[in-house]
């Protein structure tokens, strides 16, 4: 002994080393027996995407290399320098990739789609790890989130052309679930969805919004005014229903009446203007002095005279006739 130090002989050193080894092995076996294998302990594969592509070499899997998710020069991409490649989205594959013995089941990784084993919340949280600003900012608490819609139900991350991201194909993706709205767009008068000139996200924010029906603007009218700016006003003579809400008179997805009206005039007008003696009351030929059909039943009915139905700036336009 020299000072406070202890000199250990060769035999003592070997004995202590053996005891340490036994302790490590015992702890490892104990951990295995208790099933202590949390996700954080699952190793990543040693060769990254090369390991995955040894099996997943079909066209759907390889298509990822033609998307923004696999751009080596973009540090934000899962395939950017130093990133985890396939495992950035699908999770650690160290337990999934090794060869399994006959009769054993290969441990799964994160799979995407509402019909997969992975919980939808886990799938979506994985997407939000990157898409956590902009479109993903209002996701939590949105109607799609509450209904457990998976990101992969609408988006195809491996597709070079994601259908929901393009105006001409987006409505068909939305209509897979929103079938009532699809039926309305097939009526005689509708917005130009099937002409590829308009998509659902022009009015609705699919990733969440504070407005009703997840509108992109706070009110129905402000949403409509994005395209129909000439109806905004302000007018000297306002038509109260038009200023209150466009959908009081119009069906936004489609209608069998011109102008996408909820019903034809004069019936639409009479839902408000029904007081006794008002000229908008529809008379048949028998109720008229001339015995001829009423002008209020022909053509645009009330709008033959009251043509400025959204409002008028004319000094004498109080009746919306000019």
Give the location of each predicted region:
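Bacterial N-terminal signal peptides
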Residues: 16-28
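N-terminal secretory signal peptides that target proteins for export/translocation
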Residues: 1-13
């Amino acid at each position: 002994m020299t000072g406070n130090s202890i000199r250990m002989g060769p035999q003592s050193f070997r004995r202590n080393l053996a005891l340490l080894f036994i302790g490590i092995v015992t702890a490892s076996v104990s951990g295995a027996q208790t099933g202590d294998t949390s996700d954080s302990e699952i190793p990543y594969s040693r060769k990254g995407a090369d390991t995955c592509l040894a099996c997943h070499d079909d066209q759907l899997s390889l298509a990822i290399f033609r998307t923004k998710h696999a751009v080596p020069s973009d540090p934000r991409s899962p395939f950017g320098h130093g990133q985890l490649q396939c495992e950035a989205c699908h999770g650690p594959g160290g337990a999934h990739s090794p060869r399994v013995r006959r009769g054993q089941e290969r441990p799964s990784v994160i799979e995407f789609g509402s019909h997969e084993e992975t919980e939808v919340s886990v799938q979506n949280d994985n997407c939000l790890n990157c898409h956590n600003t902009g479109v993903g900012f209002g996701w939590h608490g949105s109607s799609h989130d509450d209904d457990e819609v998976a990101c992969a139900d609408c988006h195809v991350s491996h597709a070079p052309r994601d259908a929901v991201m393009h105006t001409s194909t987006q409505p068909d993706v939305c209509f897979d679930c929103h079938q009532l709205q699809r039926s309305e767009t097939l009526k005689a008068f509708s917005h130009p969805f099937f002409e590829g000139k308009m998509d659902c996200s022009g009015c609705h924010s699919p990733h969440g919004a504070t407005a009703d029906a997840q509108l992109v603007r706070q009110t129905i009218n402000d949403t409509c005014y994005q395209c129909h700016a000439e109806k905004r006003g302000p007018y000297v003579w306002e038509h109260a229903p038009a200023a209150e809400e466009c959908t009081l008179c119009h069906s936004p997805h489609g209608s069998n009446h011109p102008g996408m009206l909820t019903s034809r005039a004069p019936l639409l007008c009479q839902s408000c203007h029904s007081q006794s003696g008002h000229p908008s009351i529809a008379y048949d030929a028998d109720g008229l002095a001339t015995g001829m059909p009423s002008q209020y039943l022909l053509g645009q009915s009330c709008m033959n005279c009251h043509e400025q139905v959204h409002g008028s700036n004319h000094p004498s336009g109080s009746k919306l006739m000019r």
